Amino acid sequence: MIEMISISAAFLLSLLCETCGLVLPKSSDLAIAASNYTIIKPDLSARLDPVKAPKARRKRYISQNDMIEIVEYHNQVRGKVFPPAANMEYMVWDDNLAKLAEAWAATCIWDHGPSYLLKFLGQNLSVRTGRYKSILQLVKPWYDEVKDYAFPYPQECNPRCPLRCYGPMCTHYTQMVWATTNRIGCAIHTCHNINVWGAVWRRAVYLVCNYSPKGNWIGEAPYTIGVPCSACPPSYGGSCSDNQCFPGITSNYLHWFK
């Protein structure tokens, strides 16, 4: 039997599939400029030393095809939000975020972490047993939460699990479409054993995606409603692509992902 669960800081428990998301408890850190979070600082990356990680982790943490699928899917979702977004920024791959995701995935701990990085990052998690044909099988459940989301911010989309697992969850989705979150880095790891709320799953595929700057600020909308690209930050120079503020980079994937 194939099982799959998605997680963020709250949980929604069902028999075969789990989708939930990270909700940050306060927005006091917003006083720090969002640009500080765009690229993870080298000293933070150094605190997760690859040499100290399990030997299996030294393999490539995610394939280039998976990178492309994840980024393209996020941008597809972000460009088609409704109501339309005036300030949606185009999302690109960040290798530093991916390396941090790799280190956490290698721990095979079914929870968000490491805790000292979560004030800098947003994070979505997904786990499943059995084979899969596409990495999007682990990502699409996050988007599926859109059916339970009502703009501008979640109402009853934050059940408390595993003790009180009921009601819809939608904060995976809101992290995916948070307008100012413009970088993503993910890693996938096969865990020989992973404890998922008391049940030991064997040979489970564990996906960790880190986002920067982080989103999901309580009481705030994920984006500003308006004509697409009508409220882009000045740094984008008026460039717009697929209803998103587009950065001044080449569209060569090899350049983005090297």
Swiss-Prot record:
Enumerate the CDD domains for this protein. CAP_PI15
The alphabetical list of record keywords is:
Developmental protein, Glycoprotein, Protease inhibitor, Secreted, Signal
Where does the signal peptide begin and end? 1-21
Residues annotated as domain SCP: 71-211
Q: Where's it mainly located?
A: secreted
InterPro entries, per database record: Allrgn_V5/Tpx1_CS, CAP_dom, CAP_sf, CRISP-related, PI15_CAP
The entry's cellular-component GO terms read:
extracellular space
- Annotated propeptide span(s): 22-60
Glycosylated position list: 36, 124
A GO molecular function term, named singly, is: peptidase inhibitor activity
**SUPFAM superfamilies, per database record:** PR-1-like (SSF55797)
Subcellular location(s) per record: Secreted
Q: What family does the Swiss-Prot or TrEMBL record give for this protein?
A: Belongs to the CRISP family.
What is this protein's function?
Answer: Serine protease inhibitor which displays weak inhibitory activity against trypsin. May be involved in facial patterning during embryonic development.
Protein name listed in UniProt: Peptidase inhibitor 15
Q: Which organism is it from?
A: Xenopus laevis
